[in-house]
């Protein structure tokens, strides 16, 4: 494999994981903060808020997992190495 392609693949894999984690991380923090605020205002709605929060966490975390899949594809099944 060309060393430049190998180095670029490693850098791209690191960027894929790092950048894919920034947005969902900030979103999860914001969502959790608003969920705590909503539960503090309406304690009787805790079950609904918690259910919606966990579902939204799953959707947000899927974006990070997609970044991990791209990084693993670049490292182990590199389409540019040929």
Swiss-Prot record:
Protein name: ATP synthase subunit c, chloroplastic
Matches recorded under PROSITE patterns: ATPASE_C
Subunit structure: F-type ATPases have 2 components, F(1) - the catalytic core - and F(0) - the membrane proton channel. F(1) has five subunits: alpha(3), beta(3), gamma(1), delta(1), epsilon(1). F(0) has four main subunits: a(1), b(1), b'(1) and c(10-14). The alpha and beta chains form an alternating ring which encloses part of the gamma chain. F(1) is attached to F(0) by a central stalk formed by the gamma and epsilon chains, while a peripheral stalk is formed by the delta, b and b' chains.
Transmembrane segments: 3-23, 57-77
InterPro entries reported in the protein's UniProt record: ATP_synth_csu_bac/chlpt, ATP_synth_F0_csu, ATP_synth_F0_csu_DDCD_BS, ATP_synth_F0_csu_sf, ATPase_proteolipid_c-like_dom, F/V-ATP_Csub_sf
Pfam families named in the record: ATP-synt_C
Swiss-Prot/TrEMBL keywords: ATP synthesis, CF(0), Chloroplast, Hydrogen ion transport, Ion transport, Lipid-binding, Membrane, Plastid, Thylakoid, Transmembrane, Transmembrane helix, Transport
Family to which this protein belongs: Belongs to the ATPase C chain family.
Site (Reversibly protonated during proton transport): 61
Gene from which the chain derives: atpH
GO molecular function: lipid binding; proton-transporting ATP synthase activity, rotational mechanism
Membrane topology: Multi-pass membrane protein
Main location, first listed in the record: plastid
The keyword Chloroplast is annotated on this UniProt entry: yes
Other information: In plastids the F-type ATPase is also known as CF(1)CF(0). Dicyclohexylcarbodiimide (DCDD) inhibits ATPase.
Key word Amino-acid biosynthesis present: no
Known function: F(1)F(0) ATP synthase produces ATP from ADP in the presence of a proton or sodium gradient. F-type ATPases consist of two structural domains, F(1) containing the extramembraneous catalytic core and F(0) containing the membrane proton channel, linked together by a central stalk and a peripheral stalk. During catalysis, ATP synthesis in the catalytic domain of F(1) is coupled via a rotary mechanism of the central stalk subunits to proton translocation.
GO CC entries: chloroplast thylakoid membrane; proton-transporting ATP synthase complex; proton-transporting two-sector ATPase complex, proton-transporting domain
């Amino acid at each position: 494999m060309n060393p430049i392609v190998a180095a670029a693949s490693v850098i791209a894999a690191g960027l894929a994981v790092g950048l894919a984690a920034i947005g969902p991380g900030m979103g999860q923090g914001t969502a959790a903060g608003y969920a705590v605020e909503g539960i503090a205002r309406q304690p009787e709605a805790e079950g609904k808020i918690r259910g919606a929060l966990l579902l939204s966490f799953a959707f947000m975390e899927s974006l990070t997992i997609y970044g991990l899949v791209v990084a693993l594809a670049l490292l182990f099944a590199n389409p540019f190495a040929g």
